[in-house]
């Protein structure tokens, strides 16, 4: 039986305090999940629970919660996440640190890349908006994000932070990510279709490939260095 791909962590700085628990394959969460996360999950904020997934997000930024909820849902993750941040300054530290913490947890939970597909891509629409995402579990952190957002903010999240969130996740998770919104008139739709496309691409990339158990998907023979 394969080991669970999960991780729980706390990331504390003078600017933010992030707690999260992640299971890449959904289902149950790690046994060391912080009790406060389980309590927060009962609040119903940006959350849903089923036998296959448990999701609850509360960063203090509603639109960021919405994007991370969509990302976790369509990636097939179970994810509990809370953040107490210095929102009296602005949204930058909270949005950035949450995505760094999520990337750190993802990298820890994934462990070895042996046996996975490594590459994933997806197109996802939301009404008139269409986005494309391509992911490589490469251990070579890089991101190109072109969403063409025109508004200053969506809800309480600065539009300049939306690509920065994806870049922060890519850096911490050590993924190569390309995401672009091909068309769309509504910035909410453009952003959400991008997060959904990224989620489906990640889900494909980390999927196990039958018959390639233990095989590293690289001509180098390793994705660790």
UniProtKB/Swiss-Prot annotation:
CDD domains: IGPD. The lineage of its organism: Eukaryota, Fungi, Dikarya, Ascomycota, Pezizomycotina. It catalyses: D-erythro-1-(imidazol-4-yl)glycerol 3-phosphate = 3-(imidazol-4-yl)-2-oxopropyl phosphate + H2O. It is an enzyme of class 4 (lyase). The keyword Amino-acid biosynthesis applies. Pathway: Amino-acid biosynthesis; L-histidine biosynthesis; L-histidine from 5-phospho-alpha-D-ribose 1-diphosphate: step 6/9. GO terms for molecular function: imidazoleglycerol-phosphate dehydratase activity. SUPFAM superfamilies: Ribosomal protein S5 domain 2-like. Keywords: Amino-acid biosynthesis, Histidine biosynthesis, Lyase. This is Imidazoleglycerol-phosphate dehydratase. HAMAP family: HisB (MF_00076). GO terms for biological process: L-histidine biosynthetic process. Belongs to the imidazoleglycerol-phosphate dehydratase family. The keyword Lyase applies. Its EC number is 4.2.1.19. InterPro entries: IGPD_sf, ImidazoleglycerolP_deHydtase, ImidazoleglycerP_deHydtase_CS, Ribosomal_Su5_D2-typ_SF.
């Amino acid at each position: 039986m394969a080991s669970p791909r999960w991780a729980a962590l706390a990331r504390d700085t003078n600017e933010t305090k992030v707690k999260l628990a992640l299971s890449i394959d959904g289902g149950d969460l790690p046994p060391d999940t912080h009790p406060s996360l389980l309590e927060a999950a009962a609040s119903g904020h940006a959350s849903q629970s089923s036998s296959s997934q448990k999701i609850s997000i509360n960063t203090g930024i509603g639109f960021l919660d919405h994007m991370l909820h969509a990302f976790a849902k369509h990636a097939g993750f179970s994810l509990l996440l809370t953040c107490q941040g210095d929102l009296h300054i602005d949204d930058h530290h909270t949005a950035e640190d949450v995505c760094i913490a999520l990337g750190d947890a993802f990298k820890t939970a994934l462990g070895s890349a042996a046996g996975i597909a490594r590459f994933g891509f997806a197109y996802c629409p939301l009404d008139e908006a269409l986005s494309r995402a391509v992911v490589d579990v490469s251990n070579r952190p890089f991101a190109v994000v072109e969403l063409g957002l025109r508004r200053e903010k969506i809800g309480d999240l600065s539009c300049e932070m939306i690509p920065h969130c994806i870049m922060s996740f890519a850096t911490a998770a050590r993924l190569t990510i390309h995401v672009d919104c091909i068309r769309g008139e509504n910035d909410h739709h453009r952003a959400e279709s991008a997060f959904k496309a990224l989620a489906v691409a990640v889900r494909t990339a980390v999927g196990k490939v039958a018959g390639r158990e233990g095989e590293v998907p690289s001509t180098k023979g390793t994705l660790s260095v």
